[in-house]
């Protein structure tokens, strides 16, 4: 019988089988490591990890409400409104009305919200007579509605100086869903009869500091 040098003995099949089993188990654990080591899954809901000592917390810096809402609204206007009303919101003078100085945009907030969310059917007059406006509210979030309303009312020469808060926008979505003709465009008659009023909800001071992503107050306001 040949005697092998010390340290060069052949590995037994039992050892190889055990190593293979360990490799399979380890692979299964590491394969699910996305959840095992995921911050959102490892810690309970609502837990917030604090930054290490001496390390500044990252994230968007708070902004004044009016500026933050306007920024959000600018994106929505470019995506949903600019195609018809134009980049300057002046319309084309025939089919698409101007939003500059518009009583519809600058007037009662519930009426304005209903037009944005549901569209407008039938002739309406704002110095000139216009026809149909398609609805823009499909999939629109309260933050987006609040942003676009605030943006239009404080841009293009409009100077309302107010903020349509997320709370007010949520109320608008609820009012829209509860309409008798929910799912259909509003008419001038319906607007006059039911929606010439201010949206309910807490009024947000334009100088209140908010999270620019959620548009929710983060405490205090800029002096």
Where do the protein language model's features map onto the residues?
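Electrostatic cytochrome c docking/interface patches
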Residues: 45-77, 92-95
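Extended surface/linker regions that mediate inter-domain or inter-protein docking
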Residues: 1-44
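Disulfide-rich extracellular modules and peptides
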Residues: 83-86, 101, 165, 171
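Short, internal strand/loop/helix patches
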Residues: 124-126
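Sequence/structural segment immediately N-terminal to covalent heme-attachment motifs in c-type
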Residues: 65-92, 105-118
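Electron-transfer interface patches adjacent to heme c in soluble/periplasmic c-type cytochromes
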Residues: 98-114, 134-146
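Activation segment of ePK-like protein kinases, specifically the conserved APE
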Residues: 89, 120, 153-157
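Flexible coil segments in periplasmic/lumen-exposed cytochrome c-class electron-transfer proteins
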Residues: 128-131, 135-138, 142-223
């Amino acid at each position: 019988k040949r005697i092998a040098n010390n340290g060069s003995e052949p590995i037994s099949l039992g050892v190889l089988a055990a190593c293979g089993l360990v490799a399979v188990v380890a692979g299964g654990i590491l394969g699910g490591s996305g959840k095992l080591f995921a911050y959102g899954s490892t810690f309970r809901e609502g837990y917030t990890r604090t930054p290490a000592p001496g390390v500044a917390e990252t994230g968007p810096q708070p902004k004044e409400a009016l500026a933050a809402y306007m920024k959000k609204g600018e994106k929505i206007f470019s995506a949903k409104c600019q195609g018809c009303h134009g980049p300057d919101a002046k319309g084309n003078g025939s089919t698409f009305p101007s939003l500059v100085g518009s009583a519809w945009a600058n007037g009662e907030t519930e009426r304005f919200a209903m037009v944005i969310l549901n569209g407008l059917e039938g002739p309406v007059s704002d110095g000139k007579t216009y026809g149909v406006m398609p609805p823009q509210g499909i999939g629109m979030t309260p933050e987006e509605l609040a942003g676009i309303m605030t943006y239009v009312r404080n841009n293009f020469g409009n100077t309302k100086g107010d903020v349509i808060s997320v709370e007010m926008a949520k109320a608008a979505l609820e009012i829209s869903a509860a309409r008798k003709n929910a799912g259909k465009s509003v008419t001038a008659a319906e607007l006059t009869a039911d929606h010439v009023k201010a949206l309910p909800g807490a009024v947000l001071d334009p100088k209140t500091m908010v999270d620019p992503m959620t548009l929710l107050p983060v405490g205090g306001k800029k002096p």
